[in-house]
Amino acid sequence: MVLGKVKSLTISFDCLNDSNVPVYSSGDTVSGRVNLEVTGEIRVKSLKIHARGHAKVRWTESRNAGSNTAYTQNYTEEVEYFNHKDILIGHERDDDNSEEGFNTIHSGRHEYAFSFELPQTPLATSFEGRHGSVRYWVKAELHRPWLLPVKLKKEFTVFEHIDINTPSLLSPQAGTKEKTLYCWFCTSGPISLSAKIERKGYTPGESIQIFAEIENCSSRMVVPKAAIYQTQAFYAKGKMKEVKQLVANLRGESLSSGKTETWNGKLLKIPPVSPSILDCSIIRVEYSLMVYVDIPGAMDLFLNLPLVIGTIPLHPFGSRTSSVSSQCSMNMNWLGLSLPERPEAPPSYAEVVTEEQRRNNLAPGSACDDFERALQGPLFAYIQEFRFLPPPLYSEIDPNPDQPADDRPSCPSR
């Protein structure tokens, strides 16, 4: 008898949302089919599936051991969320010599259903970063006697939902900073910055209304700007590696000496980005809005307001929905939004981060490449174009702390 051949082995998921994207949350049932097409008859020992979800980080650092000796230190850590195995056809036995227990599959197309339940405990949102990832996948393995197994792995996306309607994410965020410029023995007037946003939580596709007042009492021309940053933090063996990425930004009008500019709800749109990851012990993804004043020839004055990017949008008049699948469907809509036009570069990395901080905490290489890689993960596979400039990195340490309110010089009248 001439044995047949395996023409194709594929995996398909039963989607829970209207966008036909396999997206799930903790407690959901993941179901689908392993599709097998053969030409002629084949004998099969087993058809197995293996489903797994895990977060993993890895990076290396060069060390100097003295006497012109260097070595590489590896940092790795992993968290497993679930590990499920099932046999769709056959048995576990690996004996090829026994004819007993083999299954015959006839020529044509065949479907084998599978299902498993995700844990009820919180799961980290799917993510791809420079030094780590959160991945969920199903692997099918077809075992035949005296032949190598046929294997296929397919990823699916998990959202750990963040509801921005919670009180902590609805609270306004505000701050004030001031800076006085010095040039040799001359002291210029201060530059002051106050900014406020209506809440902390947003979803991709929303626009942040920025309320700000910038007063320029210095002798220089300055430019107020705002930018959204993503911060990826990876943890292993008591160490932390950090990557910071520009997401979106805007520019105000140039402000001459003695002038004041007011933003009454200036809009900055959030592009399609990964939700915040706040509950994973080895990977953390956070966002912030930086409102700053670009000062030629001096370190910029900047103010950071924390953001949380969620998955369940703001409900008008307090209306709520309890359907996780409908929330998924609703949130799939913003994933198709177009990316913004190429933003201008924010303040330079050297202006706001010391050399020591850079060596200790920040990763080398282009952070833009990291963000492109994140957007190419299963959650954003359909985003075709990425036009961000390579962003500089920044620190939240303010080298010019606020002066006491009573000591603030007033801008001279003109």
UniProtKB/Swiss-Prot annotation:
Adapter protein that plays a role in regulating cell-surface expression of adrenergic receptors and probably also other G protein-coupled receptors. Plays a role in NEDD4-mediated ubiquitination and endocytosis af activated ADRB2 and subsequent ADRB2 degradation. May recruit NEDD4 to ADRB2. Alternatively, may function as adapter protein that does not play a major role in recruiting NEDD4 to ADRB2, but rather plays a role in a targeting ADRB2 to endosomes. The keyword Lyase does not apply. InterPro entries: Arrestin-like_C, Arrestin-like_N, Arrestin_C-like, Arrestin_domain-protein, Ig_E-set. This is Arrestin domain-containing protein 3. GO terms for molecular function: beta-3 adrenergic receptor binding. The gene is ARRDC3. Interacts (via PPxY motifs) with NEDD4 (via WW domains). Interacts with ADRB2. Interacts with ADRB3. Interacts with HGS (via PPxY motifs). Does not bind TXN (thioredoxin). Interacts with ITCH. Residues 405-414 have a biased composition (Basic and acidic residues). GO terms for biological process: fat pad development; heat generation; negative regulation of adenylate cyclase-activating adrenergic receptor signaling pathway; negative regulation of cold-induced thermogenesis; negative regulation of heat generation; negative regulation of locomotion involved in locomotory behavior; positive regulation of hippo signaling; protein transport.
